[in-house]
Amino acid sequence: MFVDSVELLISSGKGGAGAISFWTEKFVIKGGPDGGDGGRGGSVFFKVDNNTDTLSGLRGRNHIKAENGRPGEGRKKYGRKGQDTTIIVPPGTTVVDMETGEELLDLVEEGQVVKFLEGGKGGLGNMHFKSSTNQRPTYAQPGLPGITKQVRLEMKLIADVGLVGYPNVGKSTLIATLSNARPQVANYEFTTLTPKLGVVHISDYDSFMMADIPGIIEGASDGRGLGLEFLKHIERTKTLLLMIDAANYREMKYQYETLLVELDRYSETLAGRKHAIAITKIDSLSQDEVNTLTQTFLDDIGLKANDTLKKYKADMNYLSYGFKTDFGVPLPIKEPLFVLPISSVAHLNTEALRYALGDFVKNVKEETEAEEK
């Protein structure tokens, strides 16, 4: 089961107490202090592991605690350090302080290890408190307490392409068609209640990750429907595929503008994501009807149909649009990279979409890397 958020009480270990002890030996009547120091308490670490894809393994573990340090002993023996605890999380996990709402950690990179809570320091044994006026001190320090925090772990999916659209627009069917994912598919709204990931293969050596995310509705950024949960998950997707239902009673321009408004209201970062458009369910209409709707939509958003997507073997009997990429020409931000009518059920233009998205992801990655240099 997918769990995208879990609340935990996390504590580092308490430091061990310093020992009060005096040297004992035959013929030694009053030996000096020899109490050793207590061991440091165990620390708590977070580690990012690509082999973990949910937070479900942490469910039920209400209190995660590192081991306390052991107390010191006589003969100046130090107490053993408490054992550290490492919490394994998937990439894309954030750690939020439940008391303040502050985001404490953002765990993204595979293999990343971060110390979260330091263990308490061990107390000093009485051997440290001998002085000229006190040869046999009877005092040793207690260990310092560990640190406890109430946190919420949130997992935000990291995918190359996030599918965005109204409920029942065909996201689950598309991801099942293009990838190895098998999301629940049915003809009613909010079939997808939790995000799903699928790997879309371009070749034996090339692939990208696609996220099927719960449908968006007007007011999603205010928390209506599954809105805020949905938007939280697409924050990290690198590109967006906006899906518009050709058979929906809402006109396509309205669907498109609603999606853009909700993205913009929720996050400037999301509003700046590069996107493409798939016009779905064209098998339920005639070719002429689809072309009429597509032409109207392109006119409404100021674009002209062209044959740019022919290189991906798109069916040219259907109108489509593709941005003509060229070396040194930045990808568009406010307009779609391409507009392609598809039918996942009839497998119409789905292979063209696969390869167009593959190039889209590649181009965005190259552009991002160039900007970071």
Curated annotation (Swiss-Prot):
Region (Disordered): 62-83
Major subcellular site: cytoplasm
Residues given in the record as GTP binding sites: 165-172, 190-194, 212-215, 280-283, 343-345
Domain Obg: 1-158
Gene Ontology molecular function, alphabetical: GTP binding; GTPase activity; magnesium ion binding
PROSITE patterns, per database record: G_OBG (PS51710), GTP1_OBG (PS00905), OBG (PS51883)
Any single GO BP term: ribosome biogenesis
Pfam families per UniProt: GTP1_OBG, MMR_HSR1
Names of required cofactors: Mg(2+)
Protein keywords: Cytoplasm, GTP-binding, Hydrolase, Magnesium, Metal-binding, Nucleotide-binding
InterPro entries membership: G_OBG, GTP-bd, GTP-bd_Obg/CgtA, GTP1-OBG_CS, GTP1_OBG_dom, GTP1_OBG_dom_sf, OBG_GTPase, P-loop_NTPase
This protein's record includes keyword Cytoplasm: yes
Superkingdom of origin: Bacteria
Purpose: An essential GTPase which binds GTP, GDP and possibly (p)ppGpp with moderate affinity, with high nucleotide exchange rates and a fairly low GTP hydrolysis rate. Plays a role in control of the cell cycle, stress response, ribosome biogenesis and in those bacteria that undergo differentiation, in morphogenesis control.
Family annotation (PANTHER family): DEVELOPMENTALLY REGULATED GTP-BINDING PROTEIN-RELATED (PTHR11702), MITOCHONDRIAL RIBOSOME-ASSOCIATED GTPASE 2 (PTHR11702:SF31)
Family in the record: Belongs to the TRAFAC class OBG-HflX-like GTPase superfamily. OBG GTPase family.
Subunit structure: Monomer.
Protein name: GTPase Obg
The organism of origin for this protein: Sulfurovum sp. (strain NBC37-1)
Taxonomic path: Bacteria, Pseudomonadati, Campylobacterota, Epsilonproteobacteria, Campylobacterales
